[in-house]
Swiss-Prot record:
Protein name per the record: ATP synthase subunit beta
Reaction it catalyzes: ATP + H2O + 4 H(+)(in) = ADP + phosphate + 5 H(+)(out)
Protein species of origin: Clostridium botulinum (strain Eklund 17B / Type B)
Gene this protein is translated from: atpD
Recorded superkingdom: Bacteria
Pfam families registered for this protein in UniProt: ATP-synt_ab (PF00006), ATP-synt_ab_N (PF02874), ATP-synt_VA_C (PF22919)
Membrane topology: Peripheral membrane protein
Length: 463
């Protein structure tokens, strides 16, 4: 039974105004279907304008759309397939497969606009989530069911870090992942899909893409599509990983849509509803008594300015932040995680244990001291330092290099096999470096290795 039928009266880019009878206006967020002959265009109701016109945002390109075309109210929000059938598949914002592998026979279809779990259904049992990446596990550990932000400017390695996390989680934990590409490069999405197929982790992952060549409506809603698929698995008792690359593009698309809808912009040209939109998305990413969603969100930082409203609004929702720094890229250390800027709420002796907390604190202290001494070294040289400070500099440089690690997903570029290092091994390695056990080894022996024992082997080969 078709829903209410209206007529297209105005098209301005992705904004489509549709006239309905005043007593049968579609609800906000309803999906409107417009038959264009060769294809069907889906648009979402964003505003009611006057008595009989709804203003919608198209989820696909509007080329070929004309005034006078029929538009049918589907009487429900955009709905996407969920369940085991979505694993190993590639979707767009509407939940349509885009991998040329046939239709998805899903048991259930969920609307992308859903309420966040109620307060009484949420579970907060802080527990550490091992990633196998030394710098993260030691200094800014992730919480199971927490929200993690990867902050960094252009080209510092956010996407590579996300790919390594997907790889480690699938292989070491056997967990399910939902990867949502929001307004990023299609080439990277294509690479990710093919790499996942080759490495065999695709069967545990659903991929949803709304890339940077798509209209702002698709980029604004695709994060909700991925989240909806993840929520289904969580409610069925699974521990799910939700990757969003890039959450800034979600804000950026919201800003474009807001301007197109004629709202007055707020600070730095962003939409006045920035905090509300971000809150509506982030509040749904939570753990319940059934299962958990651990989310890792890449956050592009415009002009490396962390006070920009988009990254600043995201900050307030996160449990851990992993900050990638250009100054560390310049040192040739990857992953380029800034050990002093990155932080985690669960780096607490009651949650990670006394030993982990003490080693992490000492590592931060020695790096902080090294940073202070760098000014003196730049002016007077290392020889003018006291013996104690020379030892600090030597160990700090070893610690700095030991924070690097070869990645499995980077193996084809570096030629080095990737390493997964357990938390226990990580703590042991840093503890021994700080105690001076490896003072006689050259600092280059600590670059791009897994456990600390490999430094001894590498030193022999360098000698």
């Amino acid at each position: 039974m078709p829903g209410k039928i209206g007529k297209v009266v105005q098209v301005i880019g992705p904004v489509v105004d549709i006239k309905f009878d005043s007593d049968s206006l579609p609800n906000l967020y309803n999906a409107i279907s417009i038959d264009m002959g060769e294809r069907t265009l889906i648009a979402e109701v964003e505003q009611h304008v006057g008595d009989d016109i709804v203003r919608t945002i198209a989820m696909e390109a509007t080329e070929g759309l004309k005034r006078g075309m029929d538009a049918v109210d589907t009487e429900k929000a955009i709905s996407v397939p969920v369940g085991d059938q979505v694993l190993g598949r590639l979707f767009n914002v509407l939940g349509k497969p885009i991998d040329n592998a046939g239709e998805v026979e899903a048991e259930e279809i969920y609307p992308i606009h859903r309420p966040a779990p109620s307060f009484k259904d949420q579970a907060v049992e802080p527990e550490m989530f091992e990633t196998g990446i030394k710098v993260i596990d030691l200094l800014a550990p992730y919480q199971r069911g927490g929200k993690i932000g990867l902050f960094g400017g252009a080209g510092v390695g956010k996407t590579v870090l996300i790919q390594e996390l997907i790889n480690n989680i699938a292989k070491e934990h056997g967990g399910l992942s939902v990867f949502t590409g929001v307004g990023e490069r299609s080439r990277e999405g294509n690479d990710l899909y093919h790499e996942m197929r080759e490495s065999g982790v695709i069967d545990k992952t659903a991929l949803v893409f709304g890339q940077m060549n798509e209209p702002p409506g698709a980029r604004m809603r695709v994060a909700l599509t991925g989240l909806t698929m993840a929520e289904y698995f969580r409610d069925k008792g699974q521990d799910v990983l939700l990757f969003i690359d890039n959450i800034f593009r979600f804000t950026q698309a919201g800003s474009e849509v807001s301007a197109l809808l004629g709202r007055i912009p707020s600070a730095v040209g962003y939409q006045p509803t920035l905090a509300t939109e971000m809150g509506a998305l982030q509040e749904r990413i939570t753990s319940t008594k059934n299962g958990s969603i651990t989310s890792v969100q890449a956050v592009y930082v415009p002009a490396d300015d962390l006070t920009d409203p988009a990254p600043a609004t995201t900050f307030s929702h996160l449990d851990a932040t992993t900050v990638l720094s250009r100054s560390i890229v310049e040192l040739g250390i990857y992953p380029a995680v800034d050990p002093l800027e990155s932080s985690s709420r669960i780096l607490d002796p009651r949650l990670v244990g006394e030993e982990h907390y003490n080693v992490a604190t000492k590592v931060k202290n020695i790096l902080e001291r090294y940073k202070e001494l760098q000014d003196i070294i730049a002016i007077l040289g290392v020889d003018e330092l006291s013996d104690e400070d020379k030892a600090v500099v030597s160990r700090a440089r070893k610690v700095q290099r030991f924070l690097s690690q070869p990645f499995t997903v980077g193996e084809q570029f570096t030629g080095m096999p990737g390493k997964y290092v357990s938390v226990k091994e990580t703590i042991k390695g840093f503890k021994e470096i700080l105690e001076g056990k490896y003072d006689d080894l050259p600092e280059s022996a600590f670059l791009f290795i897994g456990s600390v024992e490999e430094a001894v082997q590498k030193a022999k080969s360098l000698a």
